[in-house]
Amino acid sequence: MITDTIANAHRYTALHPDFSDAIKLLQTLDFANLPDGQVACENPNIRLFIGSEAMRNREAAKPEAHRNHIDIQVPLSGTEAYGWIDRGRLQNGLGYNEQKDIEFFDCEPTTWLDIHVGEFALFFPSDGHAPLVGSEPFIRKAVFKIRTLETRASS
């Protein structure tokens, strides 16, 4: 997991061949004027979703993990808390959904952190994460889904 400010996101471009394109979008798109839904990306290894999501409390938040995608999650309208747990410590998997590349787990995160507007959280497949935690009823956010090195389309 990596957290940082959007202004510093360029520091991480060397970690993955598609991070440069994702970070360029992160730093240049006018998210306030984009409608909710999927945003078209030229790079076939990146999908971007913008939406308003219901928030929950920590007790209701259960970790999720992905196998084939890296998430960059960006709160656009407020503070979002994230639970984190190393994938090796996840317990009680509730079944992997291959089509959505997601599995939820019935266990507790080991760490919590707050991400504010102007910041992002980057989650690799090794990172179990429990997003959408906070005191507001809803949050508007952007989520980048970037294919892992093993599953990406060649350029």
Language-model features, listed with the residues they occupy:
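Conserved metal-binding segment of the jelly-roll/cupin
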Residues: L113-G128, L132
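A gly/proline- and charged-residue-enriched helix-loop-helix capping module
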Residues: F105-T110, I115
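Conserved short histidine dyad/triad with adjacent acidic residue
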Residues: L48-H66, L76-L90
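Structural motif
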Residues: N45, H69, T79, E119-F120, ...
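A short hydrophobic beta-strand segment most commonly corresponding to one strand
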Residues: I72, F120-L122, P137-A153
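A short, N-terminal "cap"/entry segment at the start of jelly-roll beta-barrel domains
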Residues: M1-F49, A60-A65
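A short beta-loop-beta micro-motif enriched in histidine and acidic residues
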Residues: N43, E59-D71, G88-N92, N97, ...
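Short, conserved beta-strand element in jelly-roll/cupin
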Residues: N68-E80, G95-D101, K145-I146
